[in-house]
């Protein structure tokens, strides 16, 4: 069992791995907060909380960023939100399992901004590749590893 101080936040509006988060969180007895712009369905479970943050452009992101703390985990494909969470000392993981780290977030943000600019000028017209079963598997492994890493850090003598 992992320290209950760890909470998993899910940027839930378009998250393809919510079911996987529920399963892993239940196995580790961790609370999950799903944050969306509006109402979303979630399973009835004492560890799962649903938050409708409002319809503002970044309402869900702001809600998460204002509450996340070191030792928490956020699941998001939103790179600016991941950056805010990493800066707060949390672990950020994309739904495809890619971790956002202090070392990688700057470059990831720069590439995101470049791609946004290229799309706005018509230089690039395609989007990201489709979500795959391999992405789902990579995500499960990344989430489980992050939870175990946080638990080890908390258990280490200070």
Curated annotation (Swiss-Prot):
NCBIfam families: PRK00124.1. Belongs to the UPF0178 family. The lineage of its organism: Bacteria, Pseudomonadati, Pseudomonadota, Alphaproteobacteria, Hyphomicrobiales. InterPro entries: UPF0178 (IPR003791). Pfam families: DUF188. HAMAP family: UPF0178. This is UPF0178 protein Rpal_2485. It comes from the Bacteria. It comes from Rhodopseudomonas palustris (strain TIE-1).
């Amino acid at each position: 069992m992992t320290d209950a101080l760890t909470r998993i936040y899910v940027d839930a509006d378009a998250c393809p791995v919510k079911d996987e988060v529920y399963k892993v969180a239940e196995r580790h007895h961790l609370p999950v907060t799903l944050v969306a712009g509006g109402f979303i369905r979630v399973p009835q479970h004492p560890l799962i909380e649903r938050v409708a943050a409002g319809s503002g452009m970044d309402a869900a992101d702001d809600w998460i960023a204002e509450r996340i703390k070191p030792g928490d985990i956020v699941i998001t494909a939103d790179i600016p939100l991941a950056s805010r969470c990493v800066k707060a000392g949390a672990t950020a993981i994309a739904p495809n399992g890619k971790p956002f780290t202090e070392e990688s977030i700057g470059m990831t943000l720069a590439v995101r901004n470049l791609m946004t600019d290229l799309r706005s000028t018509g230089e690039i017209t395609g989007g990201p590749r489709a979500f795959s079963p391999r992405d789902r598997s990579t995500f499960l492994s990344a989430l489980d590893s992050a939870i175990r890493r946080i638990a080890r850090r908390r258990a280490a003598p200070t």
